[in-house]
């Protein structure tokens, strides 16, 4: 069943509006926690028909290949991505720039050394280097 995309609003993807996202970097892996709102008119349909379409739409929003949905609820999800960072050896990693398919109102990227916060962005620009210790 195809669901129409809501009005031209960069924060919505179909029936999902992203509220905030946290990306926690650990070596070449990322654990992503995303909080969102489901359009009230669609909540019952998602509840009755299951969350597979919701999972697919969240993966489309993130725009990462080979992501794994670890947990999905009606207002949040946990997603894991392996091989997301470049490993330069000796505990040195590079998390490259990335573009999402919607505007993220509050994006937080956390490495073992630093936490960066972005507002109303569709792109994590410039990338970020970090160490595994």
What are these regions (language model features)?
Residues 3-133:
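Lumenal/extracellular ectodomains and adaptor appendage modules
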């Amino acid at each position: 069943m195809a669901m129409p995309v809501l009005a031209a609003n960069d924060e919505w993807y179909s029936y999902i509006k992203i509220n905030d996202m946290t990306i926690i970097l650990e070596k070449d892996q990322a654990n992503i926690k995303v909080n969102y709102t489901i359009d009230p008119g669609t909540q019952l349909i998602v509840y009755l028909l299951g969350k597979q379409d919701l999972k697919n739409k969240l993966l489309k929003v993130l725009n990462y290949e080979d992501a794994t949905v670890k947990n999905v609820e009606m207002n949040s999800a946990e997603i894991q991505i392996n091989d997301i960072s470049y490993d330069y050896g000796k505990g040195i990693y590079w998390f490259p720039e990335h573009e999402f398919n919607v505007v993220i109102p509050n994006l937080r990227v956390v490495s073992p050394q630093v936490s960066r916060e972005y507002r109303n962005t569709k792109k994590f620009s410039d990338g970020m280097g970090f160490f595994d210790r």
